[in-house]
């Protein structure tokens, strides 16, 4: 229930849907399995295992999930069958098979195999924080995060969400913190970072499980490299990697949050309810604090 990586989008709090409206809209775009010659199918599914509902509400938060099912048809299988058919035509009809005919045979083979192909599925979850006005997506890859945002917009007929563009870049802030050897406010340096240089061949330095205030680490910044990823700890509650794209990776929710969730959840539903609220609230407050050190939002 705890997101291990996060992309987020600021929302217009005044125009967020109620839980029942959101559920009705998502029902019109509910997931169905791949059929016939479809290569994939995508739609909304239940975000929690103990309920069939498409929205899991917890106080000021709403959890949703987008599921994608894709057919798996290895190119090698198609190639082997195609070679057999081409050889059969050449032997039986004593003629060569041209490029156009090979393409037609390949398409026919694909159509024959597709209904019987294996499938693989994936899902992307998101939580609406209606109190703070954020959509938190459980994926740091921009393509995955933007896809569920697009599907939500399509289902709702629009959703006012924007990219997290701040006046100062995350890379600039991270570079400054590493150079001065400490962070501001409730943030502390952890033990991992990534730095990049400039030039035709961009040098990349990855530091893992080291003291980030050590001279050999700081020297990379003094030599002109900028920080693109930085390990941070926030108020002894959350450890994470901040990226230059303002996404969060390798998130760890420390004992104080885990124990609070467990103390408020007596069963699967109760634990999910408490975890969702604590995660959304703590992450959102942390993001707002980060935004303040980044100079606020771009106008």
From Swiss-Prot:
It comes from the Bacteria. This is Recombination-associated protein RdgC. Keywords: Cytoplasm, DNA recombination. One of its GO terms (cellular component) is nucleoid. Signal peptide: none annotated. The gene is rdgC. It is found in: Cytoplasm, Nucleoid. Belongs to the RdgC family. Its main location: cytoplasm. It comes from Neisseria meningitidis serogroup A / serotype 4A (strain DSM 15465 / Z2491). PANTHER family: RECOMBINATION-ASSOCIATED PROTEIN RDGC. One of its GO terms (biological process) is DNA recombination. May be involved in recombination.
């Amino acid at each position: 229930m705890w997101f291990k990586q996060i992309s987020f989008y600021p929302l217009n709090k005044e125009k967020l849907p109620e839980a029942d409206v959101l559920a009705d809209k998502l029902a019109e775009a509910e997931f169905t399995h791949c059929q016939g010659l479809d290569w994939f199918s995508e739609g909304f599914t239940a975000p929690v295992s103990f309920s069939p509902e498409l929205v899991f509400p917890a106080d000021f938060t709403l959890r949703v999930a987008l599921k994608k099912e894709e057919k798996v048809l290895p190119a090698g299988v198609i190639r082997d069958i195609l070679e057999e058919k081409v050889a059969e035509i050449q032997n039986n009809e004593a003629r060569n098979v041209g490029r156009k005919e090979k393409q037609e045979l390949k398409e026919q083979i694909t159509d024959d195999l597709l209904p019987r192909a294996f499938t693989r599925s994936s899902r992307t979850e998101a939580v609406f924080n209606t109190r703070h006005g954020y959509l938190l997506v459980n994926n740091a890859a921009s393509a995955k995060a933007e896809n569920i945002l697009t599907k939500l917009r399509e289902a709702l007929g629009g959703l006012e969400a924007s990219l997290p563009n701040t006046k100062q870049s995350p890379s600039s802030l991270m570079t400054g913190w590493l150079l001065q050897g400490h962070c501001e406010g409730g943030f502390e340096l952890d033990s991992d970072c990534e730095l990049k240089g400039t030039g035709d061949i961009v040098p990349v330095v990855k530091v893992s499980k080291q003291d980030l205030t050590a001279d050999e680490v700081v020297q990379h910044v003094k030599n002109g490299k900028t920080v693109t990823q930085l390990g941070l700890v926030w108020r002894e509650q959350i450890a994470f990697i901040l990226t230059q794209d303002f996404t969060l990776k390798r998130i760890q929710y420390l004992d104080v949050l885990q124990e609070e969730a467990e103390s408020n959840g007596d069963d699967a539903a109760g634990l999910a309810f408490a975890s969702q609220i604590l995660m959304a609230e703590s992450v959102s407050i942390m993001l707002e604090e980060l935004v303040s050190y980044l100079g606020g939002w771009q106008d």
